[in-house]
Amino acid sequence: MVLCVQGSCPLLAVEQIGRRPLWAQSLELPGPAMQPLPTGAFPEEVTEETPVQAENEPKVLDPEGDLLCIAKTFSYLRESGWYWGSITASEARQHLQKMPEGTFLVRDSTHPSYLFTLSVKTTRGPTNVRIEYADSSFRLDSNCLSRPRILAFPDVVSLVQHYVASCAADTRSDSPDPAPTPALPMSKQDAPSDSVLPIPVATAVHLKLVQPFVRRSSARSLQHLCRLVINRLVADVDCLPLPRRMADYLRQYPFQL
């Protein structure tokens, strides 16, 4: 049998095979036979490479930003007078038991995953609501369904002041059905040894904040009380013709509580 290939001199397959050992007998085509097919014989499919993005990219952490945010919050809380530090849930309950509804304080959370806890006197007695921290913001701890509707704030004092103002606006409202305050589920337990209200966990309690419970050992100075009055009456202290030192003192605590 004769194998014909394209080229100047046809070669016999027998001659080609005879030149190589039996274990390596294979047919090698000359160079002209390996020429590429003309363009258009088979349409080439061009696929563009698109960058593949990770579905769940990890969030970029900012330890320095978190440290500054938490340090600023601690500074505000110490100036407030109603930050009680590392007291337990039982101690907070004793302090708030005989206080009117809406009296509150902020303390350190005994749960390792939280920094602060808001203890408040409700219609069902004192209860505790954890304050969670994430992405340089603070928000009230709630169940998964209502968490997207819970507002976030840059510090704890701003968070508390917002809900105090919201409750005050609802109280002054003349409408028969004022806007409800956030409904929060009762916390399970602030720590394994801490007790909360003896009611089912699924029961919701409307948050009502009226007045802070100032710690006696953190009695607020006359300067601080004057600063609170100025903050309530003036929206922007920078517009006041004050000495720089006094203006700086007002900026150190820009709140009304």
UniProtKB/Swiss-Prot annotation:
Pathway: Protein modification; protein ubiquitination
GO biological process, one term: negative regulation of cytokine-mediated signaling pathway
Domain SH2 positions: 82-163
Keywords for this protein: Growth regulation, SH2 domain, Signal transduction inhibitor, Ubl conjugation pathway
Protein induction: By a subset of cytokines including interleukins 2, 3 and 6, granulocyte-macrophage colony-stimulating factor (GM-CSF) and erythropoietin (EPO).
Tissue: Expressed in kidney, lung and liver. Detected to a lower extent in stomach and heart.
One cellular component term from this protein's GO annotations in UniProt: plasma membrane
SOCS box domain segment(s): 208-256
Residues covered by region (Disordered): 170-192
InterPro entries assigned to the protein according to its UniProt record, in alphabetical order: CIS_SH2, SH2, SH2_dom_sf, SOCS_box, SOCS_box-like_dom_sf
Metal-binding in keyword set: no
Assembly and binders: Stably associated with the tyrosine-phosphorylated IL3 receptor beta chain and tyrosine-phosphorylated EPO receptor (EPOR).
Job of this protein: SOCS family proteins form part of a classical negative feedback system that regulates cytokine signal transduction. CIS is involved in the negative regulation of cytokines that signal through the JAK-STAT5 pathway such as erythropoietin, prolactin and interleukin 3 (IL3) receptor. Inhibits STAT5 trans-activation by suppressing its tyrosine phosphorylation. May be a substrate-recognition component of a SCF-like ECS (Elongin BC-CUL2/5-SOCS-box protein) E3 ubiquitin-protein ligase complex which mediates the ubiquitination and subsequent proteasomal degradation of target proteins.
Protein's UniProt name: Cytokine-inducible SH2-containing protein
Originating species: Mus musculus (Mouse)
